[in-house]
Amino acid sequence: MARIAGVNIPDNKHAVISLTYIFGIGRTTAKKILDTVGIAPTTKISQLDDAQLDAIRAEVGNYMTEGDLRREVSMNIKRLVDLGCYRGIRHRRNLPVRGQNTKNNARTRKGPIRSIKR
């Protein structure tokens, strides 16, 4: 297993799929990285030599991934909560943030139904 950006990448999968195991890299970004490095997306990670893996590591280093990206996302949410804006209040109350209806659905975000005690 190759290790890129602190993540173990599976050897038996295509390079474009293996790179998506890194938080912050999806299919499109993985294809861009492989095009920049000059590796075919259908190449398996086990077929790459160390120089090619180092080139991929260097290119992935140009993107914000894993811990840095997670930290930035959580800081953005914390900033909204501290501001007390509408989106921050929705985050604080664990309700949908992007305008979805909550009268009938939104069970994933709201959690299990709490019964009313009489």
Swiss-Prot record:
HAMAP family, A to Z: Ribosomal_uS13
Spans annotated as Disordered: 94-118
Sequence ranges of Basic residues compositional bias: 106-118
Leader sequence residues: none
Presence of the UniProt keyword Ligase in the record: no
Keywords associated with the record: Ribonucleoprotein, Ribosomal protein, RNA-binding, rRNA-binding, tRNA-binding
Quaternary structure note: Part of the 30S ribosomal subunit. Forms a loose heterodimer with protein S19. Forms two bridges to the 50S subunit in the 70S ribosome.
Short name of one Pfam family: Ribosomal_S13
Protein name: Small ribosomal subunit protein uS13
Species whose genome carries this gene: Psychrobacter sp. (strain PRwf-1)
GO biological process terms held by the UniProt record: translation
Function according to Swiss-Prot or TrEMBL: Located at the top of the head of the 30S subunit, it contacts several helices of the 16S rRNA. In the 70S ribosome it contacts the 23S rRNA (bridge B1a) and protein L5 of the 50S subunit (bridge B1b), connecting the 2 subunits; these bridges are implicated in subunit movement. Contacts the tRNAs in the A and P-sites.
Keyword RNA-binding (UniProt): yes
Protein family: Belongs to the universal ribosomal protein uS13 family.
A Gene Ontology molecular function term of the record: rRNA binding
GO cellular component: cytosol; small ribosomal subunit
